[in-house]
Amino acid sequence: MAYVRLACLAVIFFFAASVMFTVEAGIPCGESCVFIPCISSVVGCSCKSKVCYNNHVIAAEANSVDDHHLLCQSHDDCIKKGTGNFCAPFLDHAVQYGWCFRAESEGYLLKDFLKMPKALTN
């Protein structure tokens, strides 16, 4: 009787493993993001309409910069939206929008501090 239980458990395990590898290879960002953010954000996924999509898919299907909070066409768009200070374009030139990042470099933070005043007032 123990062998029958182990055999059933082994069949279920192999079935679950094969389904997992099939889904993983086909849809890298297939999970839902209704209550929690995208778990697969490490591989370049973001939440749109309660489903996780690849970032370049979101940018390619967008009609305007306002379709997603991380889409941009210039660094000023990122700063205005408050989602970063650097707009990085995608390598695919057919995608007309970029993706906002927060670039925290020492030079960027000190650029306004090191400016000389235009006129000295006493």
UniProtKB/Swiss-Prot annotation:
Keyword Aminoacyl-tRNA synthetase attributed: no
Lineage top rank: taxon: Eukaryota
Coiled coil location: none
Intrachain S-S bonds: C29-C45, C33-C47, C38-C52
Cross-link (Cyclopeptide (Gly-Asn)): G26-N55
Propeptide: 56-122
Tissue: Expressed in seed but not in root, nodule, flower, stem, shoot, leaf and pod (at protein level).
PROSITE patterns per UniProt: CYCLOTIDE, CYCLOTIDE_BRACELET
Family matches, as InterPro entries: Albumin_I_a (IPR032000), Cyclotide (IPR005535), Cyclotide_bracelet_CS (IPR012323), Cyclotide_sf (IPR036146)
Signal peptide extent: 1-25
Keywords from the UniProt entry: Disulfide bond, Knottin, Plant defense, Signal
Post-translational modification: Contains 3 disulfide bonds. This is a cyclic peptide.
A UniProt-annotated Pfam family: Albumin_I_a
GO biological process: defense response
Protein family according to the UniProt entry: Belongs to the cyclotide family. Bracelet subfamily.
Role summary: Probably participates in a plant defense mechanism.
Domain comment, as recorded: The presence of a 'disulfide through disulfide knot' structurally defines this protein as a knottin.
Name listed for the protein in its UniProt record: Cliotide T8
Organism in which the protein naturally occurs: Clitoria ternatea (Butterfly pea)
